[in-house]
């Protein structure tokens, strides 16, 4: 399936283009649109309605990045890290620069005493679960979705980039949209891939896509 990166400045119609591409690529499988902020999610919903006679298409799902990680990647395969289906939600209580000393594979690295996923380790856990389950996380996504669209990729950081790399290596269609001049937020404060931001981050995605083609 196609892998695409669109670098678009504010006001260039990137939301229209993303939604139009999604509608044109509908198949018997679902399509997933992911964005970082709730504001971005609402913008996608409104644009999709405009292009589909005022209603959201039943085969198009829209989620924020953390909802995607929690519901589509972590919860279905939490048995690979905990004994019971005990994971609740994602905790954003970690302070900037907080060091996590638990080793990879130790459930306490990813999960708080309240059974919430540590936000800084959410994408790392998704990556770990896919690896530990021999690719079941990605295989499930391939079964459910034909295309995954990720808006606001300039806000991704840390292990997010490794997980996107895994998506780009899959049989899914992947469509990334970003604007390095609008990098306002960061999904986490992990030091992983800390040298990749702004223009360097988008160049990183360009290189990844070139490798997969």
Predicted regions and their residues:
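P-loop NTPase Walker
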Residues: 1-75
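Accessory N-terminal region flanking or inserted into the helicase ATPase core
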Residues: 2-6, 79-149, 158-159, 163, ...
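A short acidic, amphipathic alpha-helical/loop segment
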Residues: 17-21, 47, 137, 159-167
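Conserved catalytic network of the ASCE P-loop NTPase/AAA+ motor domain
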Residues: 25-26, 139-141, 167-170
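Loop/turn-to-beta-strand initiation segments
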Residues: 30, 146-147, 171-175
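Short catalytic-loop micro-motif centered on adjacent basic/acidic residues
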Residues: 33, 147-151, 213
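Conserved ATP-binding/catalytic motifs of P-loop helicase motor domains
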Residues: 74, 78, 154
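Conserved RecA-like helicase ATPase core segment
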Residues: 165-213
